[in-house]
UniProtKB/Swiss-Prot annotation:
Pyridoxal 5'-phosphate binds at residues 154-155, 182-185, 238, 267, 270, 292, 322, 350. Belongs to the kynureninase family. Its EC number is 3.7.1.3. This is Kynureninase. It is an enzyme of class 3 (hydrolase). The modification N6-(pyridoxal phosphate)lysine is found at residue 293. Catalyzes the cleavage of L-kynurenine (L-Kyn) and L-3-hydroxykynurenine (L-3OHKyn) into anthranilic acid (AA) and 3-hydroxyanthranilic acid (3-OHAA), respectively. It is found in: Cytoplasm. Keywords: Cytoplasm, Hydrolase, Pyridine nucleotide biosynthesis, Pyridoxal phosphate. It comes from the Eukaryota. GO terms for cellular component: cytoplasm. It comes from Caenorhabditis briggsae. One of its GO terms (molecular function) is pyridoxal phosphate binding. One of its GO terms (biological process) is quinolinate biosynthetic process.
Length: 483
């Protein structure tokens, strides 16, 4: 380790593997049913027992959890407005940690009392505020401090990174990504290709799943790279696909890209603070993420980026601003760039303190519980949801009591998913979704016929999951009656 560099993060014990399986979930449910004396695994009373027995149940108290009556379009004749909502939408926007109010108030008070002097004074000087997040964020993504920066928004950071790393040549100019990537990623890549003088038709490759399948197979991605990698400049996938909820094998795909001389980057919007990441050890070249989903920093809050330490002293052309300049000489103002090293050199402007304060508040939660423990909890919560959906709504399930059936398009393999399950409905979601909302359910719909449901490891519990299923059963009968 070079002098002044941070130590490497701990090596992963099993790549990105989760030890959970459907059999283990079923064994767990049966064990808890035996302990409680509840025979039926779908009984709501079991959810109560599971929640009461959960060693991490107290984390929920660290968050503001919305009441049903505070959500829009809730019908008070159908649900108690004072009851907790069924908030399973943290894959879209995470809930607010209570400590965030305190941290933000500290900086609002500081602004009121100090004005401009807040930039350089206090426990967290604003000009250095992003640096106070680096250790915690580094732990969440498995990186050294100098490999991460807190800056901008996700799409801006994708542009920042692609501007620097996408250097097309006549023979190597393609960018490989998954089909139906999040629109902002798609547009960013299209625009970067055009800005570099190429055409989207020749340089953008959107990989499709096999016919009749919803998700990509890892072996198909690797085969494509091995067969076509000499033409690929950058492999750029989502860590977790926003629509299907598929967690890609980041390590294996990165290795495949490097074998063919490709740079490999990742959009970790749905992976950050959701699943353990080991970007340093997986040898990822660069990555970007937002923080307002599982990171719980608030809508549109500050994003992050990763640049591997192999580029620590790399001075490649990039988008620049005064925050790209080393702090030690930044305020000399001589207009001679002294480029900061590593990920810090990809910053552009000073950090917005209110967004950084939200990040500092969120990191206080992750200081209290490891992402590895949260991941284990997540597997059982999502596994419980999967069991209930398959048992009560599976197309071939004997226990299904409605015409409505649901197909889970998210991979069954726990190694290939995080908190989210994407549910594909046999009836139009435009009929189902409003009825869920009326009953205090917060999930989100994605056309043509998917509702995404995410029991978040930080603040959701088994009761939330079972209440959702109960509402879904009620709505299914209503849809049938009005068909």
């Amino acid at each position: 380790m070079a002098e002044g560099q941070a130590p490497a993060p701990p090596q992963p014990e099993g790549d990105q593997e989760c030890m959970c399986t459907q059999d283990k979930v079923l064994q767990f449910l049966n064990k808890m049913a035996d302990e409680s004396g509840i025979k039926d695994l779908t009984d709501p009373a079991l959810a109560e027992f599971l929640t009461d027995s959960d060693a991490l149940k107290g984390i929920r108290d660290l968050f503001h959890y919305p009441k049903a009556g505070t959500l829009p379009d809730v019908d008070p004749t159908l649900v108690d407005p004072n009851a907790d909502s069924i908030y399973l939408c943290g894959n879209s926007l995470g809930l607010m940690p209570k400590v965030t109010e305190e941290v933000m108030k500290e900086h609002l008070d500081k602004w009121a009392k100090m004005g401009v002097f807040g930039h350089m004074t206090g426990e967290v000087p604003w000009a250095h505020s992003d640096e106070h997040c680096l250790e915690g964020v580094g732990r969440l993504v498995g990186a050294k401090k100098e490999e991460v920066s807190i800056a901008n928004s996700l799409t801006v950071n994708i542009h920042v990174l692609l501007t620097a790393f996408y250097k097309p040549t006549e023979t190597r100019h393609k960018i490989l990504l998954e089909s139906k990537a999040f629109p902002s990623d798609h547009y960013a890549i299209e625009s970067q290709i055009r800005l570099k003088g190429r055409t989207v038709e020749e340089s953008m490759v959107c990989m499709e799943p096999r016919e009749g399948e919803e998700t990509l197979r890892t072996e198909d991605i690797i085969d494509y790279i091995e067969n076509n990698g000499d033409e690929i400049a950058i492999v750029f996938f989502s860590g977790i696909q926003y629509y299907t909820g598929q967690l890609f094998d980041i390590k294996a795909i990165t290795e495949a890209g490097h074998r063919k001389g490709c740079l490999v980057g990742w959009d970790l919007a749905h992976a950050f603070a959701n699943v353990p990441l080991h970007l340093h050890w997986w040898d990822v070249d660069f990555a970007a993420w937002c923080s307002y989903k599982y990171g719980c920093t608030g809508a549109g809050s500050i994003a992050g980026l990763f640049v591997h330490e192999r580029f620590l002293h790399d001075k490649r052309d990039r988008m620049l601003g005064w925050w790209s300049h080393k702090m030690s000489s930044r305020f000399t103002m001589d207009n001679v760039l002294d480029l900061d090293e590593g990920a810090a050199g990809y910053r552009i402007s000073n950090p917005p303190i209110h967004c950084v304060a939200a990040m500092l508040g969120s990191l206080k939660i992750f200081d209290q519980v490891s992402l590895e423990n949260l991941r284990s909890r997540s597997c059982y919560l999502t596994g419980y949801l999967e069991y209930l959906v398959k048992t009560l709504f599976g197309e071939n399930s004997e226990q299904r009591t409605t015409k409505l059936s649901i197909l889970i398009i998210t991979p069954e393999n726990f190694h290939q998913r995080g908190c989210q399950l994407s549910l594909k409905f046999s009836s139009p979601i435009d009929v189902i979704y409003p009825e869920l909302v009326k009953r205090g359910v917060a999930v989100d719909k994605r056309y043509p016929n998917v509702i995404r449901v995410a029991p978040v490891h930080l603040y959701n519990n088994y009761v939330d999951v079972r209440r959702f299923i109960s509402v879904l059963q009620e709505v299914a009968h209503i849809v049938e009656d009005h068909a």
